From Swiss-Prot:
Catalytic activity: (S)-malate + a quinone = a quinol + oxaloacetate
UniProt KW keywords: FAD, Flavoprotein, Oxidoreductase, Tricarboxylic acid cycle
Keyword Flavoprotein annotated: yes
Segments passing through the bilayer: none
Top enzyme category: oxidoreductase
Pathway: Carbohydrate metabolism; tricarboxylic acid cycle; oxaloacetate from (S)-malate (quinone route): step 1/1
InterPro entries in the cross-refs: FAD/NAD-bd_sf (IPR036188), MQO (IPR006231)
GO molecular function, one term: 2-hydroxyglutarate dehydrogenase activity
Designated name of the protein: Probable malate:quinone oxidoreductase
Keyword Metal-binding annotated: no
Amino acid sequence: MFISEAIGPEDRFDAVLIGAGIMSSTLAVLLHELDPCMRILIVERLDSPALESTSAFNNSGTGHAANCEFNYTPLQSNGRIEIEKALSINSSFERSLEFWASLAEMGRISPATFLNFLPHISFVWKEADLDFLKQRYLQLSSEVAFQRMEWSDDKAELKEWMPIVMQGRPTSEKVAATRIQRGTDVDFGALTRAYFDSLEESGSVHIRLSTEVIDIQRFGQDPWKLFLKSDLNSYCVEGKFVFLGAGGGALSLLQKSGIPEGKFYGGFPVSGQWLVCNETQVTNNHNAKVYGNADVGSPPMSVPHLDTRWIRGRKSLLFGPFAGFNTKFLKYGSNWDLFRSIQMGNVGAMVQAGLENIDLIKYLYGQLQQDHISRVDSLQNFLPNAKSKDWHLSLAGQRVQIIKKTSKGGKLKMGTEMVSSSDGSLAALLGASPGASTAVAIMIDLLRSSWGEKMSTKIWQDRLRRLIPSFGEDLNSNESMLKATRDRNDSLLGFGEKNQ
């Protein structure tokens, strides 16, 4: 047992962030820019940052702006399409671009190392989906954020938008697509490493790799004590504030903290796989992110897409994701993760959520039965001329969907949720999509809830507006501000200078 007196000043921190992924690194950069003297510790159990969900191959989608993802615009029972989530995600991603633009202007990061621009396309070929896409286009394009969206059912034009997608299609097939040319591909692994390179030069931010959090405790109103274990030794550090940003590992850490707010949460792990193509004769002929619509009855996570990705500078095509199931909460986790997470407070909610999501379980079972031939068959809905030999299977990351006890029983949630202690001294980010692309907006919300007093000071307000000039404004209702923000972002990040 460690006692407070055994902890030296070098192991006392203003903030301790668990997990060296995009969430913790974003929060660390924000805190450091707002208070350069703040002592921050980042703890990562693996030997390098960004190896779990932040890694580009592990991340289900990059450059999320709700331009083309159907799961953010569901069809309602009244025949209307719900677009509020798409508007929220789009403005959140613009905040991320704004933040990166400011850091680039200050020389902290280089956009060329992690950011590429390419069109985002929604593509359909079924009769019911044609009507859905047209209505989606009409509703979204009436909003300022999406007013540059294009729609077409002209096959000649669509062949210009996505040549290899249109090759080999039956002449009688009806197709349609929408396009937003101002789309992005983001290598969040590269961005995270760039964040850490900048932070390590500060002297006030410390990163400890190959270090695992064994326990988290707090006595009264004292700082949090975190018991750590590295390859060399075991020791304890103190943190006035703790952020659990360990992806799928955040739930178990939240449970260890013992805060009552985390008592009724559980998790349902879902693994993923991609078909990957690195053949230049294929990759050179496709430069877009193309999203289709999920089959009727399939869960939102099943939305198929053909992604152009630049990963560590190399252009690849990824198709999927194909879902799977195992009991790990992290890609490099333990098969006991799910079982260890079951407690008296969440077992009822987990059982009820399972019973209410039999269709999801059936879907996952079906995905597990697929072989390479059946996966390529799915790919050929997008690329009729795709050749099996050009594509190989790659294991993606783990996502842990939130199971939450509510007044109506256990519910499975598909988004992200921040769980905080009543005094704001500890916060955990649970869930998955859209995740990385909205990290800046998520972390600003965390600052409001956990650092509210400092957030109200003039110095923090001024520094935030230096980082995010539109801070405090609603971009979806302020057309002139949105235009000015996008013009600035495009100029500083280099939109139009490449991939066009």
